[in-house]
Amino acid sequence: MKNAIKTIFILSSFLLVFSLYSFADGKPFEGEVTYEITYPESNLDASVMEMFPKSMKVYIKDEFSKTVLNTGMGKTSNIFNSKEMYSITLLDMMGQKYALRSSTEIINDKIEKAPSSQIEFLDETKVISGYTCKKAIVTIKDELIKTESELIVYYSEEFSQKNLNKDNPIFHGIKGIMLEYEIDTQGILMKFTASSIEVKKISKKEFKIPKNYEVTTEAELKSKFGGM
C-alpha cells in the first residue's frame, strides 16, 4: 500500500509538468488533447509497468488546464489556473478520493528547487496529428546529483494561450503546445505523443474540486499512509 501511494505521488509530480502548456501568438485553443504514452528503453518488470499510464488527456479552457492519467491504482488529475497561479491535484485511488491544493508559494518553491534547464531550438520539423511541429532539445542539469540529461520536444505554434506553463520548471521556454515530448524521472523515460487534438467547448466544472473529494495536504496524506 505504501509503495502504491508513493508511486501515485511520483505520477502527481509528473502532472505538474504535463498539464502546463504555453502557446504562441496563434489562435486561442479550447478543447482536448489526447496523448499516447510509451516507455523507451524501459527494463522494468511487466507487473510494475502495469501501474503506469498508457495515455493522457489534457483539457484546456481560458486560463485553466486539466491533465488526467489513469493508472493501475486509479485516476490522478491536476488542475492549473495560470491567472491565479494555483494547482489542484485530485487523487482517486482504491476507493478513496483526495484533493490537494498547491498555492503560489508552494509552486514557486518547487520551481526554485527544480534542476536548471536550457533549451536549444532547431530548424527540424515534424508533422504530428496534422500540425507542423518544430524541434527543441531541453538539457536538464541537476547540480545536486551531478547529472545532465537531454529531452526532445516537438511543439506547434499554431495556438495561443498565454501563461499556461507559467510554473513549468522544465519546459517554460517552449513557445508552443508540445505535441511530442519526453520526461525522465527516477530513471524512467516517458514519451508523450499527441494522438488526437479536438477543438470543442469544455465545461468549467472540469476545473473544480468534486464534492465527494476530501480536501487535504500532501503532508497530511503522507501521514495517513505511514509517512512514505
Task: List where the protein language model places each region.
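Extended soluble regions of mature proteins
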Residues: 23-228
